[in-house]
C-alpha cells in the first residue's frame, strides 16, 4: 500500500469537492439546517383534544363540562342534551372524544336502563388521546370514590374506540407509509434525472429535438407517475394482506390522489435537479426536502402535538394533506368527496412546481 498514492488521490478528491461549491455548501448547511429544525420541532407537546358532551339534562351536561374544564389540553366543542350527539360528533370529525351520559336510575326515573357512561374515542391515532382518556378515567374514579354512598356511586365508564378498535399503531402508520414511500422515491428519481442526463450529455440531445418543454415534461412524468401509483397501491395491499388493514370503498378515492401526489414530488426533484450542478448536490437537495416533510407532516408524531409554527410549515408539504386523506379513507371511512377534498392543496402545489419545472426546462 503506497501512502503517497493515497495522499495524492485524497488531494484530488478534496479539490473536486471544493470546486463543486453547491455540493460543498449543501454538505455543510444541510446538517446545520436539520439539527435546528429537528431540535425545535421535535418537542411534541400535548395535543388539544376536542370533546363533545351529550347528557339527558342540561344540568347533567353542565356538570360534566365543569369537571372536564379542570383537565389540561381539553376544549369543549359541544354540550347538548340529545342522546347520540357526542357519538355523531366523533364520527363526523367534529370532536376527538365524545362523552355520552345515560339516564340515571333514581326515584324520579326508576325505569332508566342501567348503562355505563360511554367514552367514544377517535382512535385513528391512539397516541393523540391516550393521556386524555387516562385523565378522564382518573377524574371519574376519584369522583366515585368521593361519594358517601357507594351503592349510589353512579354508572361505570365504558371506552369505545372508533375506526381503530384495537388501537393498533400499525394501522395508523401503514396508510401514511404509502405517501412517504412515494414521496421519497419520486423526489429521488426526479432529482437525479436531469443532473444525470446533463452529465452524460443526453440532455443536449433532448433539447436539440423538435419538442416543446410541455411535451418533454409530460413524457418524463408519465412513467414515473405510473411507478409512484403502483408503489402506493402495493403498500396498501401489503398492509391489508399482512396486517389486516381495512380497505373500504373510499380507498378508491384515495388511490385517485396517488398520480397527482407522485407527479408533484417528481417535479419537485426535477426542479432541484435543474438548479443543481451535480448528481450529489441534487440528491442532497432531495434529502433536505423529504426529511422535514416526514417530520412536520404528522407521520412520525401526531400533527396536533407539534408546535404551532411547525404545524403552519407542515401544512405547506403535500405529504401532510395526503396522510389526512389516507386516514379519512382507510380508517375513518369518510365519503369519497371528503377524501378528494384533501387533494386540493396537493393539486395547487402541483401547479406551482409544474410552472417552475417548465421555466427551469426552458432555462437549461
Segment roles from a protein language model:
Residues 42, 173-191:
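Long, hydrophobic alpha-helical segments
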Residues 213-286, 291, 337-343, 347, ...:
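Alpha-helical transmembrane segments and their short interhelical loops
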Residues 1-171, 338:
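Extracytoplasmic/periplasmic domains immediately adjacent to an N-terminal transmembrane anchor
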Residues 17, 93, 188-209, 221:
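Transmembrane helix boundary and interhelical loop/hinge segments in multi-pass membrane proteins
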Residues 29, 36-48, 276-316, 320:
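Transmembrane helix segments
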Amino acid at each position: 500500500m503506497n501512502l503517497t498514492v493515497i495522499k495524492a488521490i485524497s488531494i484530488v478528491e478534496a479539490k473536486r469537492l471544493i470546486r463543486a461549491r453547491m455540493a460543498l455548501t449543501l454538505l455543510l448547511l444541510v446538517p446545520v439546517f436539520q439539527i435546528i429544525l429537528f431540535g425545535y420541532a421535535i418537542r411534541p407537546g400535548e395535543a388539544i383534544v376536542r370533546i363533545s358532551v351529550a347528557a339527558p339534562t342540561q344540568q347533567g351536561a353542565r356538570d360534566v363540562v365543569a369537571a372536564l374544564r379542570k383537565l389540561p389540553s381539553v376544549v369543549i366543542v359541544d354540550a347538548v342534551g340529545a342522546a347520540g350527539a357526542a357519538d355523531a360528533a366523533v364520527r363526523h370529525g367534529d370532536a376527538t372524544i365524545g362523552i355520552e351520559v345515560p339516564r340515571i336510575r333514581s326515584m324520579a326515573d326508576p325505569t332508566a336502563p342501567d348503562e355505563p357512561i360511554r367514552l367514544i374515542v377517535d382512535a385513528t391515532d391512539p397516541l393523540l388521546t391516550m393521556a386524555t382518556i387516562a385523565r378522564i378515567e382518573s377524574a371519574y374514579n376519584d369522583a366515585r370514590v368521593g361519594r358517601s354512598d357507594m351503592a349510589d356511586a353512579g354508572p361505570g365508564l365504558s371506552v369505545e374506540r372508533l375506526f381503530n378498535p384495537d388501537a393498533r399503531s400499525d394501522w395508523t402508520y401503514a396508510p401514511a407509509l404509502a405517501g412517504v414511500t412515494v414521496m421519497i422515491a419520486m423526489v429521488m428519481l426526479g432529482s437525479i434525472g436531469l443532473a444525470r442526463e446533463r452529465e452524460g450529455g443526453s440532455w443536449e440531445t433532448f433539447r436539440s429535438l423538435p419538442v416543446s418543454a410541455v411535451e418533454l415534461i409530460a413524457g418524463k412524468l408519465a412513467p414515473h407517475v405510473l411507478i409512484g401509483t403502483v408503489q402506493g397501491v402495493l403498500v396498501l395491499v401489503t398492509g391489508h394482506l399482512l396486517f389486516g388493514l381495512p380497505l373500504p370503498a373510499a380507498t378508491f378515492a384515495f388511490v385517485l390522489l396517488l398520480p397527482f401526489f407522485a407527479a408533484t414530488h417528481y417535479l419537485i426533484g426535477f426542479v432541484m435537479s435543474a438548479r443543481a450542478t451535480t448528481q450529489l448536490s441534487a440528491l442532497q437537495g432531495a434529502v433536505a426536502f423529504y426529511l422535514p416533510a416526514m417530520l412536520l407532516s404528522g407521520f412520525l408524531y401526531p400533527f396536533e402535538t407539534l408546535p404551532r409554527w411547525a404545524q403552519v410549515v407542515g401544512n405547506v408539504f403535500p405529504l401532510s394533506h395526503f396522510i389526512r386523506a389516507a386516514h379519512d379513507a382507510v380508517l375513518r371511512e369518510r365519503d369519497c368527496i371528503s377524501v378528494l377534498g384533501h387533494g386540493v392543496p396537493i393539486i395547487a402545489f402541483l401547479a406551482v412546481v409544474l410552472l417552475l419545472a417548465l421555466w427551469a426546462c426552458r432555462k437549461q
